[in-house]
From Swiss-Prot:
Stated role: Promotes hydrolysis of glycogen and lipids, and raises the blood sugar level.
Recorded GO CC terms: extracellular region
Subcellular location: Secreted
Family listed: Belongs to the glucagon family.
Keywords, in A-Z order: Hormone, Secreted
Coiled coil stretches, renumbered: none
Gene Ontology terms describing biological process: response to starvation
Organism: Oreochromis niloticus
Superkingdom of origin organism: Eukaryota
Name assigned to this protein: Glucagon-1
Underlying gene: gcg1
Induction conditions: Produced in the A cells of the islets of Langerhans in response to a drop in blood sugar concentration.
Length: 36
């Protein structure tokens, strides 16, 4: 059970990381688009 909980928490952590990267990517795109 502890293994399942760990992998579940880890997948949640990865999802958060992906979300943050996506937001950063969006911000960069908006910035470069506005600069153009």
């Amino acid at each position: 059970h502890s293994e399942g909980t760990f992998s579940n928490d880890y997948s949640k952590y990865l999802e958060d990381r992906k979300a943050q990267d996506f937001v950063r990517w969006l911000m960069n795109n908006k910035r470069s688009g506005a600069a153009e």
